[in-house]
C-alpha cells in the first residue's frame, strides 16, 4: 500500500462511535464487524442464482458515520471466481451519517 492510501485510511477509520451521538448511532452501529452473506439473484427468465458474499461495517469520520463495503463473491474467493450470474462480481459501499441538526440519517 502506498503512503497516500495509508494516510487516507488513517483519517477515514475510527475505533468507536462519537460520544456526542453514540445513542443515535446504535441503529446501524449494531452491524459493525464482518458478515458473510448469501446472495440470491433472479434472472429475467425466472432462473434463480445463489452465491456467497461478505459485508464489512466500520466506524469512519471520527465515529460520526458508518461505512459498509459489500463484496460478491467473498474476498477470499477472488480473483478466480467466475462472474456471478445476473449481477456479476462487484464491490459496493454505503456511507451512513447521522445528522443531529435534523435528527435523521443521511444515506
Describe the role of every protein-language-model region:
Residues 47-50, 87-89:
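Short glycine/proline-enriched turns and hinge-like loops at secondary-structure junctions
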Residues 32-36, 62-69, 102-106:
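Short, hydrophobic/aromatic-rich segments at coil-to-beta transitions
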Residues 42, 62, 73-76:
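Short active-site-proximal "capping" loops at secondary-structure junctions
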Residues 25, 67-69, 80-81:
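Periodic aromatic/glycine/histidine/acidic cluster detector
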Residues 52-59, 70, 92-97:
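Hydrophobic/aromatic beta-strand elements that line small-molecule binding cavities or substrate pockets
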Residues 1-48, 56, 60:
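Amphipathic/hydrophobic helical signal segments and adjacent flexible N-terminal regions
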Residues 38-42, 71, 98:
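A generic structural motif
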Residues 72-107:
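Helix-adjacent hinge/juxtasegments
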Amino acid at each position: 500500500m502506498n503512503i497516500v492510501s495509508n494516510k487516507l485510511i488513517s483519517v477515514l477509520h475510527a475505533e468507536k462511535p462519537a460520544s456526542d451521538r453514540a445513542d443515535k448511532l446504535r441503529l446501524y452501529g449494531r452491524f459493525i464487524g464482518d458478515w458473510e452473506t448469501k446472495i440470491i439473484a433472479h434472472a429475467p427468465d425466472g432462473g434463480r442464482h445463489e452465491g456467497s458474499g461478505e459485508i464489512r461495517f466500520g466506524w469512519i469520520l471520527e465515529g460520526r458515520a458508518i461505512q459498509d463495503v459489500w463484496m460478491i463473491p467473498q474476498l477470499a474467493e477472488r480473483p478466480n471466481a467466475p462472474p456471478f450470474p445476473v449481477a456479476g462480481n462487484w464491490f459496493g459501499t454505503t456511507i451512513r451519517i447521522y445528522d443531529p441538526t435534523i435528527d435523521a440519517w443521511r444515506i
